[in-house]
Each structure stands twice: as C-alpha cells, then as structure tokens.
C-alpha cells in the first residue's frame, strides 16, 4: 500500500540521552504553494538538532513534509511552522532549521531558525555544526 501525506509526526526514544550529539538531515524536496499566486514553491531544508529524550522518526517526517504540497504559505511562516512542530514533538536541546527557498521572481529566500532549551549550552558541539552558507544567486543559474 503506498504511503500517503500525513501531518502526524512520530518520535522514538533517544538511545543515548546522556550524550550531546548532532543529528543532521538534508530535506531537498519540499513543495508548497505560494499563497498569493497558487504557483508551486520549492525549498531545500537543512535540519540540525541535538536530541534530549526523543528523536523524530524519518518516515513520519517525510510524510509530514509531503502533506504541505497543496497548502499555501509564505516562506517565513512555513519554515517557522515546521520548526515549531518539530520542537513541540521532540523538545530538542538545540535545533537549527534552514529553509533555502528556490528562486521566484529573481529572488532567493533563506529563512534560518534557531532554538535552544533554556539553560542548555555546549559551545564545543555547536562549534562542530556545519556553517550556514547563504544562497548566492548567480545570473543564468
């Protein structure tokens, strides 16, 4: 039976809650609709998080992202919604979500969200996170 889009995110217990470690996910195939024109908008999300007690289950994340393909939303609203839903689900020690929205009308948009649990800090591991590289539009590309 084929999978269907679903807003139901699932989680599982962190197998090593005693340790800070980074989970990196590359999510290159996100699609939703422009709320003004109804035209498709495409984004590449890059997610980094340091789990506390839970991790997000990958198939549910895929189906969750797929569920937005026919929904209209501004880039900033959609990126924040996804971050809020993930934070609400797994309450990570740290989360960073970069939404890299593809060129529309000659403009690229990057939306970066960062969240930390109150009082949590680990500068050593945060220094190991991949550097955010802002999109650079080049004519003809």
Swiss-Prot record:
Keyword annotations of the record: Cytoplasm, NADP, Oxidoreductase, Queuosine biosynthesis
UniProt xrefs under InterPro entries: GTP-CH-I_C/QueF, NADPH_dep_7-cyano-7-deazaG_red, QueF, QueF_type1
The keyword NADP appears for this protein: yes
Listed SUPFAM superfamilies: Tetrahydrobiopterin biosynthesis enzymes-like
Gene3D superfamilies to which the protein is assigned, alphabetical: 3.30.1130.10
Keyword field contains Oxidoreductase: yes
Uppermost EC category: oxidoreductase
Entry superkingdom: Bacteria
Active-site residues annotated for this sequence: 34 (thioimide intermediate), 41 (proton donor)
Pathway: tRNA modification; tRNA-queuosine biosynthesis
Enzyme Commission designation: 1.7.1.13
Residues at which substrate binds: 56-58, 75-76
Pfam hit, one: QueF
Catalytic activity: 7-aminomethyl-7-carbaguanine + 2 NADP(+) = 7-cyano-7-deazaguanine + 2 NADPH + 3 H(+)
GO cellular component: cytoplasm
Subcellular location(s) per record: Cytoplasm
PANTHER family attached to this UniProt entry: NADPH-DEPENDENT 7-CYANO-7-DEAZAGUANINE REDUCTASE
Family that this chain belongs to: Belongs to the GTP cyclohydrolase I family. QueF type 1 subfamily.
Record's protein name: NADPH-dependent 7-cyano-7-deazaguanine reductase
